[in-house]
Curated annotation (Swiss-Prot):
Gene Ontology molecular function: any one: rRNA binding
Listed CDD domains: Ribosomal_S15p_S13e
InterPro entries reported in the protein's UniProt record: Ribosomal_uS15, Ribosomal_uS15_bac-type, uS15_NS1_RNA-bd_sf
Any one annotated GO CC term: cytosolic small ribosomal subunit
GO BP annotations, alphabetical order: translation
Membrane-spanning parts: none
SUPFAM superfamilies in the cross-refs: S15/NS1 RNA-binding domain
Name by which UniProt lists this protein: Small ribosomal subunit protein uS15
Function: One of the primary rRNA binding proteins, it binds directly to 16S rRNA where it helps nucleate assembly of the platform of the 30S subunit by binding and bridging several RNA helices of the 16S rRNA.
Species of provenance: Polynucleobacter asymbioticus (strain DSM 18221 / CIP 109841 / QLW-P1DMWA-1) (Polynucleobacter necessarius subsp. asymbioticus)
Subunit structure: Part of the 30S ribosomal subunit. Forms a bridge to the 50S subunit in the 70S ribosome, contacting the 23S rRNA.
Length: 89
């Protein structure tokens, strides 16, 4: 397995609601957060990389929409996820 696959499997295992869960909002938000955190140093070093920045902004928007959905669906799960990932300080 590649390093990214191992990290992905670990993130899914840590945030899954059941054994085969890969699509719950918690898992999706956690995976997006990991990808966003990996890209952030790239933009500190490459400020003019606007093409990749657009992809980053799309990921941030998708994460925000998933969090909004989860907040409306189950507020307790939303708060637990925000606390776990350290978002919205």
């Amino acid at each position: 397995m590649a390093v990214a696959d191992i990290k992905t499997a670990e993130i899914v295992k840590d945030n899954a609601r059941s054994a085969n869960d890969t699509g719950s909002p918690e898992v999706q938000v956690s995976l997006l957060t990991a990808r966003i955190n990996e890209l952030t140093p790239h933009f500190k070093a490459n400020a003019k990389d606007h093409h990749s920045r657009r992809g980053l902004l799309k990921m941030v928007s998708r994460r925000r929409r998933l969090l909004d959905y989860l907040k409306g669906k189950d507020l307790d799960r939303y708060r637990a996820l925000i606390e776990k990932l350290g978002l919205r300080k």
